[in-house]
Amino acid sequence: SGQGKSGTGIPGIPIESRKRCSLADRMGRLINNGGSKECETAVVNALRWLKKTQNKNGSWTNQKEVGMTSLALLTFLGHCETAGSEEFGDAVLSAITYLIDISMKNNGKLATDLKDDHWCYEHAIATYALAEAYTLCVRGFGENISQLEEAVMSSGQFLINSQHQGGGWDYAYSEDSARGGDVSIVGWHLQALKACKFTGLD
């Protein structure tokens, strides 16, 4: 309980991400880099707190719910918790479903408020989270999550289509703003693109 899904027979997960699913490997790397078993305990306790504070609709908080939910979901996925995990599976699936519903409702756009010029942050972080969920849950452990593939495809494609002509991304997804983009926005979008690539989806 609280140890995440595990197993060595998970070739669907890129090798860069696979080690998170081995408790022994995770603990070994933790100890070798100055951590302790208490660090792992603290992480599990934090995940339990997140589970306890999750909203009934699968989101977290009452502000910027899409972004906050995506960040919370990424913490579970980072511990190799999937929709099928014994202790946290319900929380993971509920969060994924919440984000899928947002994507489906908005034609791939992932944001709490599409009128807010800063919604590009939420879209990138949420796309990252959904892609990570697809790779871990579907490719890695063969879990069936309705419409997850469609959400990843549509949200990822929107991200690609909305790139600034200068190569970056900018507020409100302006494609021709004078400044050409924002470094922090670009960073999240590159992370989302990397996660989308790992899904293996075309």
Please place each PLM-identified region on the residue numbering:
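Preference for long, amphipathic alpha-helical scaffolds in soluble/luminal domains
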Residues: 1-202
